[in-house]
Amino acid sequence: MIELKTLLDLPLHFLHLKQIHCLLLTSPIFYTRRDLFLSRLLRRCCTAATQFRYARRLLCQLQTLSIQLWDSLIGHFSGGITLNRRLSFLAYRHMRRNGVIPSRHTFPPLLKAVFKLRDSNPFQFHAHIVKFGLDSDPFVRNSLISGYSSSGLFDFASRLFDGAEDKDVVTWTAMIDGFVRNGSASEAMVYFVEMKKTGVAANEMTVVSVLKAAGKVEDVRFGRSVHGLYLETGRVKCDVFIGSSLVDMYGKCSCYDDAQKVFDEMPSRNVVTWTALIAGYVQSRCFDKGMLVFEEMLKSDVAPNEKTLSSVLSACAHVGALHRGRRVHCYMIKNSIEINTTAGTTLIDLYVKCGCLEEAILVFERLHEKNVYTWTAMINGFAAHGYARDAFDLFYTMLSSHVSPNEVTFMAVLSACAHGGLVEEGRRLFLSMKGRFNMEPKADHYACMVDLFGRKGLLEEAKALIERMPMEPTNVVWGALFGSCLLHKDYELGKYAASRVIKLQPSHSGRYTLLANLYSESQNWDEVARVRKQMKDQQVVKSPGFSWIEVKGKLCEFIAFDDKKPLESDDLYKTLDTVGVQMRLPDELEDVTAES
């Protein structure tokens, strides 16, 4: 019997488990403790569909288990894969058929399983809880509140919460965490303040949940107050759990110096901590710092997860760091890390922005799963590279794959139509947003249509569309019209569009520069001088733009006519000269062809 108990703890093949089952049924020495061994066997037979069916038959053979063993079985099944969770429901049903009364430990794991599955009915178990008089038990009640709130069923959660006379920290945390999970971060913060007023001390779970809330609404002041409350408990240095949440909160609030300070003071860090710091730098547009932290992470022998890699790839895409992005891609392949939809979409975006359309297509085709963001990234890639018809065709391939477009998808495909001169196709797509997809076009979609009409010289139609807009035209809409007027030398309409843009953005130097360019195109130098004077009178300062360039895997930042002399300046300017030659080459070839 001892040998059999030891045998059941070993990693066994399913066939061996069935052989042990036969032994239990046929050998008389196991008769008195057969149910105990069957329950242990049952824990091992539920990792695949075939084993699930076998496990159901095993359940039916159990007859004399105590409530403690039933609770143990249900708890084991409820925390596993989907099939296991369904097995926990069957175990409960069989337990009741055998006349066993559930305990306060029976329902919390069942509730955890039912709320995770989403397609199951939690109210049936709630009714059983009331039937057996366990609804007033704090342990069971907190599980109900946690389940209802995490599923967004706040009416039911609030009724239980308001009816509870002895609200402990678990009760409060269940509500706070539920609000955070369902996008009501502000409500979570209100509940936290109320909890503090009642004198209930927060635990680590409460602090983590409320820090998430502060990060989501980017309320660094509130986040700092929570940080202060945590320090008041006498914990000078944060553990991994709290520290990672603090780094994440400060990062989302763009306070990357605070995030770095917390990170540096932590005695130990895990992949979540490193990822939070990297994501914070990327969100704050400190892309180079984010990539440097990633390199430090690898040197510290901390293996990145999918979220880490997606953040780093996003940083590479923003600054066009193709070499670094390829290294990350190679790291994923070398370490057999499956490229999920998030990482795949970011990779496509990186290769598209760096001019490597073929590599983007390769990543797209190799993805096992594609969501709307993946399709949109690829459509946008074709559009950005001038393959308007391919972008248009891919959009309809996406629809035939039963993936519904979102607002960004329409932005991408309408932009493709604008760049490809597909006026009628763009017009049909724009009308289909409301007619077929029940989606109200936003100002950015109108801007795409204005750009589409304007590029084809249909300036009056573009202006008429602006006048019919159900919302106030934005600077992007007027900017699209202005660009088209400049292209087709319609200076009168261009002046009107420019005046509307300047009215919306009176402190934006670029708008005045565009208007001055329009006047210089028409050789109206008096108006050019007037615009320059207007900028000076209104103290509009033209801030120099800056760019990044990757040289030998190192990212360099520079502005126009930069006279700084970094160590790598020679390599940097050689690279820029090469880029300049390549940009001029098509025009020079065209001139030679025309002359010949």
UniProtKB/Swiss-Prot annotation:
Belongs to the PPR family. PCMP-E subfamily. Coiled coil: none annotated. InterPro entries: E_motif (IPR046848), Pentatricopeptide_rpt (IPR002885), PPR_At4g14850-like_plant (IPR046960), TPR-like_helical_dom_sf (IPR011990). Residues 477-552 are annotated as: Type E motif. One of its GO terms (biological process) is RNA modification. Keywords: Repeat. This is Pentatricopeptide repeat-containing protein At1g50270. GO terms for molecular function: RNA binding. The gene is PCMP-E42. It holds the Pfam family PPR_2. PPR repeats lie at residues 66-102, 103-136, 137-167, 168-202, 203-237, 239-269, 270-304, 305-339, 340-370, 371-405, 406-436, 442-472. Residues 553-584 are annotated as: Type E(+) motif. It comes from Arabidopsis thaliana.
